[in-house]
A protein has these predicted regions:
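Pore domain of cation channels
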Residues: 209-220, 382-396, 402
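Terminal peptide-recognition signature
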Residues: 25-28, 66, 251, 259-262, ...
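Short amphipathic alpha-helical interface segments
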Residues: 84-112
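Conserved PDZ fold ligand-binding element
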Residues: 103, 109-110, 120, 251-274
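Functional transmembrane alpha-helices
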Residues: 2-5, 174-207, 231, 235-246, ...
Length: 453
């Protein structure tokens, strides 16, 4: 029973920490997309699932909610997939001519195959340009695209609810209404594309990709600053008073206890912890080291034998100090730099395996999260801050589908002056996913050997 509770505790704290941090990461992408005028159809805590609790924002049209698969979160930013369909403009125009129409009817009218029409509808659905149409009693079929589509509410300028403040709700059509395009089919499709990720320039695309990473780093930074300023940090006190004695240690066997003040070691007077440390180091290797100490105002003495490779088992006294904001910020920033250096070492072949052996998958993070939670809120939040840093910088690795991999593709396209062929991007993504999977399996194996077996 104890083992089961331990596992459940690890799973709970691990999922809680990762879900919140990934949700915040996706929140960065969401906010950046909205700031760039890009449509976002969904923003959820948890992975996509047919079962969810949600609320659709009347102001921006985005569906906010939570799913049972609490393994992170996601923001459905329109136009993230590098897909293009040559006849999407015709399909879009036809849907707005009819208001509501089936894929089969569109295929007949446009003299296209149903597969071609469905491909175009999937693209337009992902752009937030159309909506699925379900008649009374019908429900979405998991794993399948809808076969009937309808128009979205549009104002005179062509804006939809996904366009936020620019949408004139008072003078807009209703969902499923026929609406006349204000321009040609190709131009209207180009307008719709301008509200997607693909329709933005390099700077805005890079900003949207980096926003999640920035939020993770900022989250970790603020967490550490808060902990250092409010809860404080434990620092050593340079005094001869013992902070802790290891149970079963040489010092414990000699009768030395927590709170005893070491007066001398092997005849060397001690008034600070550095005096104690130096005296023990010099006396190591002797069989009759005399230690004089004070407890409750009374002096005591004892003798210990300490080999050169043995430890006495005493620790320095500590105290909790609340740091000022500047010192807290400086110390927090040092952790940011350390994490960044660690991730950079992962890219250096001579250090790759060393870093991977020290890294953890979700299993290791869950176990350590449970241990941190048991140690107290400050320890748990400190660990969460370090994981947030790691999550942010790991996403910078140039491996698709990570943000860093996508950014590399954007840089290549900027230098080349054109978009990479869809086939090339697809191949690169598959290779990246395979590499990412191998890294995960390796770290999972290490965690199982480290924490379970």
């Amino acid at each position: 029973m104890e083992t089961v509770l331990s596992v459940l505790s690890s799973v709970f704290w691990g999922l809680l920490m990762l879900s919140v941090l990934v949700f915040l990461h996706e929140g960065g992408h969401f906010l950046a997309a909205r700031a760039c005028g890009v449509r976002v159809t969904e923003f959820f805590l948890g992975l996509p699932c047919r079962f969810d609790i949600h609320h659709t924002s009347r102001r921006i049209g985005t569906k906010f909610g939570v799913t049972p698969l609490l393994l992170g979160g996601y923001a459905a930013i329109c136009g993230m997939d590098p897909t293009d369909v040559s006849y999407a403009d015709r399909v879009l125009a036809a849907i707005y001519r009819h208001g509501r129409v089936t894929v089969a009817d569109l295929a007949v009218e446009l003299e296209l195959s149903e597969e071609d029409v469905l491909e175009a509808c999937a693209l337009l659905l992902g752009w937030g340009s159309i909506a699925p149409w379900y008649e009374e009693g019908e429900k979405p079929s998991p794993g399948y695209y809808p076969t009937k589509y309808q128009t979205l509410p549009r104002d005179a300028a062509g804006y939809t609810t996904f366009d936020g403040r620019r949408f004139d709700r008072e003078h807009a059509t209703a969902e499923g209404d026929v609406w006349e395009l204000p321009c040609g089919e190709a131009e209207f499709l180009a307008r719709e594309r301008s509200h997607t990720y693909l329709g933005q320039g390099f700077v805005k695309r890079a900003f949207m990709l980096l926003a999640g990473i920035i939020v993770n780093i900022l989250t970790g930074f603020l967490l550490l600053m808060s902990i250092y300023s409010i809860a404080g940090v434990t620092v050593p006190v340079d005094t001869n008073v013992i902070g802790q004695v290891d149970e079963g240690s040489i010092a414990s066997a000699a009768g030395i206890e927590d709170g005893d003040a070491i007066l001398s070691v092997d005849g060397v007077s001690c008034s600070t912890w550095m005096d104690v440390y130096d005296a023990i180091g010099k006396a190591a290797g002797k069989d009759d080291i005399a230690i004089e100490y004070e407890r409750d105002g009374k002096k005591h003495s004892t003798t210990v034998a300490l080999k050169e490779d043995e430890r006495l088992g005493v620790y320095v006294s500590t105290q909790v100090v609340r740091l000022d904001p500047i010192t807290s910020a400086r110390l927090s920033f040092s952790y940011v730099v350390q994490t960044a250096k660690g991730v950079m070492r992962l890219l250096q072949p001579q250090h790759t395996m060393e870093i991977l052996d020290k890294s953890s998958s979700i299993v290791g993070i869950s176990v350590m999260s449970s241990q941190a939670a048991a140690a107290g809120p400050a320890t748990f939040l400190s660990f969460a801050a370090l994981i947030s840093f790691s999550l942010g910088f790991m996403n910078l690795l140039p491996i698709p589908p990570l943000d860093g991999g996508k950014l590399v593709i954007e840089i290549i396209q900027k230098i080349a002056g054109r978009e990479l062929p869809l086939k090339v991007q697809t191949i690169v993504s598959y290779v990246g996913i395979a590499l990412f999977a191998l890294l995960f399996i390796y770290m999972l194996r290490s965690d199982i050997l480290r924490f379970i077996l």
